């Protein structure tokens, strides 16, 4: 569709909404990337920012789910000693990992070149730095060796930069600050294998938000309380020291991003 290149910013946003309704998330990503690349000197609107986030979360989410399922089957076949099947599964897993890498590289490049440099408001800075941390974390989920180490280090740098701004500039009940705490704590638990630090971060974020619950604005009440519930769910899970299946039940910021309505 050569006509797509000629669409205005507003038309690309509309097409992205259309693609979302049709659950055609790859195309939704394409439309929102065009919007993001046209705004070098100004920020995306909150609506545009959320559309971009939702598009990428759905595209990456489908592959992350596929990877987990295939990895689980691979472990079962390995334990049964089915080497031929394991070889087939490894190749198939590699295909999914190639897709995951391409998706993460795409959004990380966009964040580096356009979105982070053009952000001026504390809220959008935290949003994009959190997003940067999220996609490096997704790389760390399946990469190995030096690549995993690099992805984990980049995750930490991005989340830490986001946290510094969030703690200084956003209230404890702000959905973006809460969503950051949620995903940062998941990073500590899943990638760094630091359950104590994960629990401390999640508990502090939850407690600080609870103490200021009466200051919550009506429009962000639903988003904030949802993320607080997810923080509490993870704390319950992590502190009860459950079986190996724990990781699959861990909650992250929801697909409709933690900043919606802000």
UniProtKB/Swiss-Prot annotation:
Q: Where in the cell is it found?
A: Cytoplasm; Nucleus
The answer on whether this UniProt entry bears the keyword Nucleus reads yes
Tell me where the signal peptide lies: none
Pfam families, alphabetically?
14-3-3
Which InterPro entries does this UniProt record tie to the protein?
14-3-3, 14-3-3_CS, 14-3-3_dom_sf, 14-3-3_domain
Q: Where are the transmembrane segments?
A: none
Tissue-by-tissue expression: Expressed in seedlings and roots.
Its primary localisation, in coarse terms, equals cytoplasm
- UniProt GO BP: protein localization; signal transduction
Give all cystine bridges in this chain: none
UniProt keywords, alphabetically: Cytoplasm, Nucleus
Question: What factors induce this protein?
Answer: By wounding, drought and salt stresses, benzothiadiazole (BTH), ethephon, hydrogen peroxide, abscisic acid (ABA) and incompatible and compatible races of rice blast fungus (M.grisea) and rice bacterial blight (X.oryzae).
Any one Gene Ontology cellular component term annotated for this protein: nucleus
Q: What does this protein do?
A: Is associated with a DNA binding complex that binds to the G box, a well-characterized cis-acting DNA regulatory element found in plant genes.
Assembly and binders: May form a complex with the transcriptional activator VP1 and the bZIP transcription factor EMBP1.
Q: Name the family the entry cites.
A: Belongs to the 14-3-3 family.
Query: What is the name of the protein in this document?
Result: 14-3-3-like protein GF14-B
């Amino acid at each position: 569709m050569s006509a797509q290149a000629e669409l205005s910013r507003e038309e690309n946003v509309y097409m992205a909404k259309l693609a979302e309704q049709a659950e055609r998330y790859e195309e939704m990503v394409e439309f929102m990337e065009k919007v993001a690349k046209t705004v070098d000197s100004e920020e995306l609107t909150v609506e545009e920012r959320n559309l971009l986030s939702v598009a990428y979360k759905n595209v990456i989410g489908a592959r992350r789910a596929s990877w987990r399922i295939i990895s689980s089957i691979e472990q079962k076949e390995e334990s049964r000693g089915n080497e031929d099947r394991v070889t087939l599964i490894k190749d198939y897993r590699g295909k999914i990992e190639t897709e995951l890498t391409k998706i993460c590289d795409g959004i990380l490049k966009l964040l580096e070149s356009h979105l982070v440099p053009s952000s001026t408001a504390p809220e959008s800075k935290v949003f994009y730095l959190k997003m940067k941390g999220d996609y490096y974390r997704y790389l760390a989920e399946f990469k190995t060796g030096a690549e995993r180490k690099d992805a984990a280090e980049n995750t930490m740098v991005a989340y830490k930069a986001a946290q510094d701004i969030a703690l200084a500039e956003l209230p404890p009940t702000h959905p973006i600050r809460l969503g950051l705490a949620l995903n940062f704590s998941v990073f500590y638990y899943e990638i760094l294998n630091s359950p104590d630090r994960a629990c401390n971060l999640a508990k502090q974020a939850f407690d600080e938000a609870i103490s200021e619950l009466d200051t919550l604005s009506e429009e962000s009440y639903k988003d904030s309380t949802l993320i607080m519930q997810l923080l509490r769910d993870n704390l319950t899970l992590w502190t009860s020291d459950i079986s190996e299946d724990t990781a699959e039940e861990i909650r992250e910021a929801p697909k409709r991003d933690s900043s919606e309505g802000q």
